[in-house]
Swiss-Prot record:
Coiled coil: none annotated. It comes from Staphylococcus aureus (strain JH9). It is found in: Cytoplasm. It comes from the Bacteria. Gene3D superfamilies: 5' to 3' exonuclease, C-terminal subdomain, DNA helicase RuvA subunit, C-terminal domain, Nucleic acid-binding proteins. This is Holliday junction branch migration complex subunit RuvA. One of its GO terms (cellular component) is Holliday junction resolvase complex.
Length: 200
């Protein structure tokens, strides 16, 4: 229904962004809102997919058509909902996920929150041979720098989460420096470490 939303990126939260267009602010759930950070207060185009449930209508947004297509493929798998699909795409590119599927790499897939061995196997069974590994979408509006790592993303998402909890940028400046010196297995782990640093 909504192929994309184009407008001013007004707000950035750990799980979603807000884009204002024609006087309306659209709340858009995203895999990794940090990827949009450099566009805050500027015009942005976000590819979208509207999912209607009994209790809500949710708009999901993506940095490229390839990412959007991967999301739509994942939510067709039994046991995979939008939340799990977003978690997979939060720290992996579509091609990385496709390679894991084609190589039947269950171990790679089970590293994501909410994805157990049974669900990982179902992803492979349902999608192997149906997802094509291609060059990353060349017209993607937003690209994560080549030097950006999963660890960088964990830290940046943790910082967004801490800021959303009300901590000031001044308080978080020292925290970010410390977090960047360590390695974490998840965003939650980085957030917990950050909270300990803030209250210490």
């Amino acid at each position: 229904m909504y192929a994309y939303v184009k407008g001013k990126l007004t707000h950035l939260y750990p799980t979603h962004v807000v884009v204002e267009t024609a006087g309306v602010g659209y709340e858009i759930q995203t895999p990794n809102s940090y990827r949009f950070q450099k566009h805050l207060d500027h015009e942005v185009l976000i590819r979208t997919s509207l999912i209607v449930r009994e209790d809500a209508q949710l708009l999901y947004g993506f940095s490229s058509e390839e990412e959007k297509d991967m999301f739509l493929s994942l939510i067709k798998v039994t046991g995979i909902g939008p939340k799990s699909a977003l978690a997979i795409l939060a720290t992996s590119t579509p091609n990385e996920v496709k390679r894991a599927i084609e190589n039947e790499n269950d171990t790679y897939l089970t590293k994501f929150p909410g994805i157990g061995k049974k669900t990982a196997r179902q992803i492979v069974l349902d999608l192997k041979g149906k997802v094509k590994i291609t060059e990353e979408d060349s017209d993607s509006l937003l690209q994560v720098d080549a030097t950006s790592t999963v660890q960088d993303q964990f830290v940046q998402e943790a910082m967004l989460a801490l800021e959303a909890l009300g901590y000031s940028k001044r308080e978080l400046a020292k925290v970010e420096k410390t977090l960047n010196k360590n390695k974490y297995d998840s965003v939650d782990e980085a957030v917990k470490a950050g909270l300990q640093l803030v209250v210490s």
